[in-house]
Amino acid sequence: MGKVHVLDHPLIQHKLSYIRDKHTGTKEFRELVDEVAALMAFEVTRDLPLEAAEIETPVGPAKVKKLAGKKLGLVPILRAGIGMSEGILRMIPAARVGHVGLYRDPETLKPHEYYVKLPNDVEERELLVIDPMLATGGSVVEAINSLKKRGAKSMRLICLVAAPEGVAYVQKEHPDVDIYLAALDEKLNEKGYIVPGLGDAGDRLFGTK
């Protein structure tokens, strides 16, 4: 069973409080999501392997540690996942970026795929799947299904907030995927929104309704 990591770092929790606040405007919301994503990247990549190397500093040789050739990939789920991708890319700029486009039917709440573009060597990469909200889990499960069909073998899921129902569904369908959250919230309401949540992440990121 994949592990669930709730990242309780004070800076993450402080910034998340403003992300949740309904009075936070689009510009500040976008900046805060970017900042929290960057902070989360530190924890998500904590166990990446290192290898010894030698370099020359301005005053002489030094033994250092570098990432051990691990290939990484980011896969934001469109559209809201885009809001987190730049923050993570600043931490791991060599990562390749793919995209999965899904929309959720407002009546059935079921996800529908409309776009997939991935690195050619997706099967060789550790993929960081990004979506700010893990509500029912339907969209994330569909995205991971799509990635696995195209050869992906190793994935981690990164979300700002999640409902227990969504976490349980992802764990049931994809027990090999670890989940990283800034917060695990109380529940879903009757409309499928996370409570207390932060509203519609896509609308708040892009100033739409």
Curated annotation (Swiss-Prot):
Regulation (activators, inhibitors): Allosterically activated by GTP.
Signal peptide: none
UniProt-listed SUPFAM superfamilies: PRTase-like (SSF53271)
InterPro entries: PRibTrfase_dom (IPR000836), PRTase-like (IPR029057), Upp_B (IPR034332), UPRTase/APRTase (IPR050054), Ura_phspho_trans (IPR005765)
Positions of uracil binding: I194, G199, D200, A201
Cofactor note: Binds 1 Mg(2+) ion per subunit. The magnesium is bound as Mg-PRPP.
Cofactor entry: Mg(2+)
Pathway membership, UniProt: Pyrimidine metabolism; UMP biosynthesis via salvage pathway; UMP from uracil: step 1/1
Superkingdom to which the source organism belongs: Bacteria
Binding positions for 5-phospho-alpha-D-ribose 1-diphosphate per the UniProt entry: R79, R104, D131, P132, M133, L134, A135, T136, G137, G138, S139, D200
Pfam families xref list: UPRTase (PF14681)
EC number(s) given by UniProt: 2.4.2.9
UniProt xrefs under CDD domains: PRTases_typeI (cd06223)
Keyword Cytoplasm annotated: no
A biological-process GO annotation: UMP salvage
Protein task: Catalyzes the conversion of uracil and 5-phospho-alpha-D-ribose 1-diphosphate (PRPP) to UMP and diphosphate.
Family: Belongs to the UPRTase family.
Stated name of the protein: Uracil phosphoribosyltransferase
